[in-house]
Amino acid sequence: MASDAIISGMKTKMDKTIDLVKKDFGTIRTGRANPSLVEDIRVDYYGNQTPINQLGNISVPEPRMLVISPYDKGIMKDIEKAIQTSGLGLQPTNDGVVIRIVIPELTGERRKELAKVVKSKSEEKKVAIRNIRRDAMEDLKKHTEGMSQDEIKSVQDQIQKITDSYIDKISALTAEKEKEITTI
């Protein structure tokens, strides 16, 4: 049935949106060390912009410290420079073997700014979920041949319930991240 395919496709797209929310939130600094803070920072490696996570291992030996062990020790200066210019406010130290990054405490003002960023990213993804719902409803309208009004209404209700559940998931992730940011 066409409605099953529409709902299945919609859920797949919404799952990808939830994954993006998690990834976006992972890049927001909270005062705790997390490899996702730096793993996507791009470094010029032999003419290619390569993410740090492809250039070495990123570990968390302490709650507020990241350690990057590059596979190629010759790129350490480039990794260090990329982190410094990333806008995250991190100061890496290079001892010739590994790069250490101590995650500084967040100020109250910075926490408020980050909470706003979280809300903004959350709203963007909620809009994306609603757009996916709209597309699913339009697909349903195109495939209503042979369906009764009750069946159409039932599928529309199902689409709305699924949408609401995904919006709730984003809200829960947002609340969790805001709590993480504002907890001192």
Swiss-Prot record:
The keyword Oxidoreductase belongs to this UniProt entry's keyword annotation: no
Alphabetical keyword list: Cytoplasm, Protein biosynthesis
Molecular-function GO terms, alphabetical: ribosomal large subunit binding
Name by which UniProt lists this protein: Ribosome-recycling factor
Function: Responsible for the release of ribosomes from messenger RNA at the termination of protein biosynthesis. May increase the efficiency of translation by recycling ribosomes from one round of translation to another.
Cellular localisation: Cytoplasm
InterPro entries in the record: Ribosome_recyc_fac (IPR002661), Ribosome_recyc_fac_dom (IPR023584), RRF_sf (IPR036191)
Name of the gene encoding the protein in the UniProt record: frr
Gene Ontology cellular component annotations, sorted alphabetically: cytoplasm
GO biological process: translation; translational termination
Predominant subcellular localization, coarse grouping: cytoplasm
